[in-house]
């Protein structure tokens, strides 16, 4: 099963995306803020991270920097999923290594899932990080 980490501070939005992704067959782990997202990555190795930008404790941009500067995490594709639609926000996220920038208010949840599946289909098995296994 494909593991996805969703880092989102809004509980209603978080629950909605968790439900939609689980319905589509994803194993979903949730984090309520950037710090929690980084902490969860110590034990949960997803094949993709969905990351909000505006969050308490640590912004999504700061989380993205940490992920892309960590040799163990930098190859995990990160999709920014936010309501910020300014060109500067988009450029910053993509320059830091996000593979896609999706504005939540401009896409239905099922459309977002379809975009995520399309992105994942573009990676070969060797490029997608393997999920953590129990030894």
PLM region spans:
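Helix N-cap/capping motif at the beta->alpha junctions
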Residues: 30-39, 60
